[in-house]
């Protein structure tokens, strides 16, 4: 029904070889022709799911931001843009002092520079994008505040020795700003890719027989990276992928144990593979893309998925390289 109600989706389906699910996704973005074109192009590149998920996440972030901004405005709060890392004036009120006392939103309620910016981030428990206001003073020194961190503020990114902000040239500051923006954008891309990858794994692991190379991969990961397996979150992920309830105890899943006990030999091997893959995923963090992907378990893990039909997102290709940030 969603496809039939979208002229763009109907035309794209007639012109390109789209699945019903892809056509429904196009209908979802019927009000954004540019995004529809990007999605159609992604079909050819095999990255449709990645582009769609990033678009959904972007929309969810904007919606969360707008909702919180409206609420703050209705409360009479001045909303400002989130400051750059080296902003000389805007500071989080909680990082400031006023005289001998720590500044708080309550104690600085009458500060002329009081405002707030809206920060949107992923809540990993609810798996939703949430917007939170951060109260600031828009000109802390003018309004009588001091920031104890001013004397030690550095670039805060990259390797090597960090240079204090006040010693940086304009060019170095701009490079640091661009680096920070890149990290923020790549963090968002990684979050979207993780969503797609885990959905793909859940679908792929419904199979009844183990894929080619399972034994070598599982044995190799256990032998070379035994530290992966004890992660408590691994059983939760594996149970979720395999359609089982979450662990009933400290890292233990009775449902998974029962599932293996009732499975035939081939399906039990698939479940074992799921446990190892879940152990890898449990060690994936927001900063995983920043590490050298040619060392440790990262390379073999992503290589195994790619060999079996998973299309890496651009950020996952980056993560598989030896590039670091």
Where are each of the predicted segments found?
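Short, Lys/Arg-enriched phosphate-binding patches
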Residues: 1-4
């Amino acid at each position: 029904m969603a496809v039939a109600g979208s002229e763009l989706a109907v035309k794209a389906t007639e012109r390109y070889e789209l699945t019903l699910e892809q056509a429904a996704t196009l209908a979802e973005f019927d009000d954004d022709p540019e995004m529809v074109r990007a999605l159609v192009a992604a079909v050819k590149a095999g990255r449709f799911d990645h582009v769609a998920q990033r678009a959904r996440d972007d929309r969810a972030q904007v919606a969360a931001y707008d909702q919180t901004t409206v609420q703050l405005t209705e409360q009479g709060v001045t909303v400002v843009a989130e400051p750059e890392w080296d902003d000389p004036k805007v500071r989080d009120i909680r990082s400031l002092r006023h005289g001998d006392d720590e500044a708080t939103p309550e104690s600085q309620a009458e500060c002329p520079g009081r405002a707030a910016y809206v920060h949107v981030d992923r809540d990993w428990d609810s798996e939703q994008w949430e917007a939170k206001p951060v109260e600031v003073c828009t000109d802390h020194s003018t309004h009588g505040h001091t920031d104890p961190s001013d004397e030690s503020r550095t670039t805060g990114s990259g390797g090597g020795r960090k240079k204090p902000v006040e010693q940086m040239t304009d060019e170095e500051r701009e490079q640091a700003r661009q680096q920070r923006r890149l990290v923020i954008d790549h963090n968002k891309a990684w979050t979207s890719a993780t969503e797609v990858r885990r959905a793909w794994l859940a679908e792929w692991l419904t199979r009844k027989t183990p894929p080619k190379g399972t034994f070598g991969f599982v044995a190799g990961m256990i032998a070379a990276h035994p530290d992966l397996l004890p992660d408590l979150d691994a059983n939760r992920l594996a149970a979720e992928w395999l359609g089982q309830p979450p662990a009933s105890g400290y890292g233990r899943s009775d449902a998974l144990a029962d599932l293996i006990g009732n499975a035939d030999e081939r399906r039990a091997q698939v479940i074992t593979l799921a446990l190892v893959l879940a152990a890898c995923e449990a060690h994936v963090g927001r900063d995983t893309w920043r590490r050298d992907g040619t060392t440790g378990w990262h390379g073999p893990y992503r290589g195994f998925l790619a060999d079996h039909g998973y299309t890496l997102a651009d950020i996952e290709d980056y993560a598989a390289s030896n590039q670091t940030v």
